[in-house]
Amino acid sequence: MDYTQFLDSNSINWDYTKIMDICKISYILDRFSIKENDKILDVGTGTGMLIPFVHQHNPKGNIKGVDKSINMIEIAKEKFKNVQNIVFQLADVESDDIKGTFDKIILFSVFPLLKHKISTTKKLIENNLSDDGKLLIAHPESTKSLNSYIGTNAPIYTPILLDIYQQRNMFRQAGLYVEEAFENDRIYYIILHK
């Protein structure tokens, strides 16, 4: 079973098995400086669990969620069908072109699952990020905690998350601009820009 099949088969109960830490999410999104009317892309949106938090920061801005799981996208569409400025698209961010330019791009709890982390991040920045936009990679846990979870749940989760300084340096070596990189025992985030 690959990860997309895993997501599709678990989508119906996904929201009930995942706990969102409001304090961590709010802290990370505050650091990201979402502005009123920002156009936002939520990569790996799943069932749209992050959308209410993003929408709270930016109730008038357009939000687009993309995910490669058709079942996850269908659930997200149903959950937000009455909210006019939120749309969803079935897409694999690594292989599909995402239409549009965005002020903010968010990869929340999805980055370790990318097979081509650097090239995908670079593609999103070059093709989809506005000139003064920012891209956020974030996790509501530390590298150690996440990698421990991944290790106990292989083979569904096989990638690992690099130490924040290693990842920052890899981005810099690839010519990407890292504005901020932070990790403690509770959160992990990197903010990049053009």
Which residues make up each language-model segment?
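Class I SAM-dependent methyltransferase SAM/SAH-binding core
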Residues: T47-E94
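Short alpha-helix
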Residues: P159-A174
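A short acidic, Gly/Pro-enriched loop at the edge of an enzyme's catalytic core
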Residues: D97-I105
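Short, glycine-/aromatic-enriched active-site segment of Class I SAM-dependent methyltransferases
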Residues: E141-Y157
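A short glycine-rich, Lys/Arg-flanked "PGG" loop and its adjoining helix->strand segment in the class I
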Residues: S119-D131
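Conserved beta-strand signature within the Rossmann-like core of class I S-adenosyl-L-methionine
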Residues: D132-H139
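Conserved class I S-adenosyl-L-methionine
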Residues: M1-S33, T143
